[in-house]
């Protein structure tokens, strides 16, 4: 059997994702589509609107054959580390291809640029540092430095282009046999916050925003299973998961933390801990808080990730230890259909990473220890006894079928 | 002017406390009654039902002339340290007497027993250790060891007797000129949980319990000002402060803490951190949680204090540094009437501790740093923008008149 990998967040799974899965299958004629999916928190440092289990169910219904977890130490990360983790898992699962959606739409410039980045790594790093020293934020500095070392075809200010570039770069660096592919995204702007009226495709950001107001508005932009899963979740748990819900916990935590302890938290650098401590006293919402902390130097995304690490109490030291090898240390399926199951059956005897269906066995793995803390922080907003039940779900849920 | 000191929690101020203030004034014929009052959390490790400012207002209306804060590092402590802190503040304020309520009711056995404890300190400590090693909890071990070194008149299993004993002992140890006095308590049982029907005096525990159900039931057991203050507080803040309200925060915190970090927390000893970590997963309420953690060795009170220290993130190291000298480092009035103001005016030029009316100036004091964290944890349960307002109150509230 032949497998293609995709890297996803499905926050939540919508018609654009459905299209991506269908196009991936068509373009690669793979037998099995494997999605590596962020767990409880996303790359941009936000709690996923519903837990990984619900999102995995949506993915299965949307045509994915196997959903595996991208654990927190890789998921809540810069694009570079996010890609390293995802590629290492797809590689461990013997995917022949990795197919990502991008603004650009053809693979050649990704390969060229990635090669340039790998072979002129030090030169590029040096340039990035120079720009950052000038007060330019990391994303911009990265693009400018890329231009300086001779690149001029790929627009890396586009969020999916930059992610795609990092997948290809990770493939090269990990000497993986995975062949990268790309398909053009049909949602023009990732950050769109209004729902389009003439189409049935909208960004996940706009869908999440509209879910806060009314479920009905989003029905046409998501497959039926997504709609139903979201409804059931809210009916059972009485909430979505969004930053505002976690704000009381973040505030409580920041208020009772010493500045020295904030400095230990992942991604905290250069005195931002003092800004955080000061702004939290007056902030009455997460949005207010981040607006007060924001400077030119820190992107909103970076600040959101820092807040996520504070919430989950994940330190620089822990993260560094966990991702030292730049690879995942286990593969954890969250959901699979018959095809997914058959594929796993076929490859598992050759796999060099443990295939984990019961998280209990991973208790002492540094990556899993972080993943577990993140799950525990994630369910903290649920009322009892739902919170306790959700906690036990992390250990007790076998991969969904 | 002549001042008498009392040590209180007023959680909340009730008719029994009113009687105590009146009797104290009568017995000592002091011009000024000074109450040292626990701040946000009590000696038994519970959040006070309303903030210190509200409780100070009740005290003033109940006849106290000056209310000063017993800061967290002394307030949330064993009886011994609680007494050391309180006596040091009353001593700094030149109180001539300290008058406490006790089950026993006459002062001689307190003085005798305290002297015994001071002069046979090492012998007593050694005996206590022996009993604790046998698995007996600290309170019992303390009483048994006291009996062993020759004491036989004071029943130290009574909570107010033991507190009183520690006041007298602290007076001796601190070589203070304060003269101790006691009056018999008229609430027979401190831990009573039902309201008496034939009287207008009930324990604070039973009053707190009944407040959860209905305000009306408690009206006859508290002065009018207490009743009104409680009503206004609940009307404004939509809540009382009790452990169950803080349980989501405690649970979140314990779940995301490493075992090593729990070991650093004040009063955590002998592997209790593993019991805490294990029990929290299944616990759906604070009461369930503590019941699951409880062993013979740990009293309920001790466990509650540990939970309070976890909630406020107060470590052994911080506490040790703060109370190294066994004395308070400042005197902070929370409320005063004209008599209280006149008294302060008279004594302040002779005081050796700073008199703090704006907490901002104490920012770098180790005791105040802990007090501040406790305030911040205490207000975390309030909805926004009330939480932010309450935080600013800590700095901005001048002593009430």
Swiss-Prot record, chains A, B:
It catalyses: cytidine(34) in elongator tRNA(Met) + acetate + ATP = N(4)-acetylcytidine(34) in elongator tRNA(Met) + AMP + diphosphate. It is found in: Cytoplasm. ATP binds at residues 7-20, 101, 160, 185-186. GO terms for cellular component: cytoplasm. Its EC number is 6.3.4.-. It is an enzyme of class 6 (ligase). The keyword tRNA processing applies. Gene3D superfamilies: HUPs (3.40.50.620). Coiled coil: none annotated. GO terms for molecular function: ATP binding; ligase activity, forming carbon-nitrogen bonds; tRNA binding. GO terms for biological process: tRNA modification. Keywords: ATP-binding, Cytoplasm, Ligase, Nucleotide-binding, RNA-binding, tRNA processing, tRNA-binding. Belongs to the TmcAL family. Catalyzes the formation of N(4)-acetylcytidine (ac(4)C) at the wobble position of elongator tRNA(Met), using acetate and ATP as substrates. First activates an acetate ion to form acetyladenylate (Ac-AMP) and then transfers the acetyl group to tRNA to form ac(4)C34. This is tRNA(Met) cytidine acetate ligase. It comes from Anoxybacillus flavithermus (strain DSM 21510 / WK1).
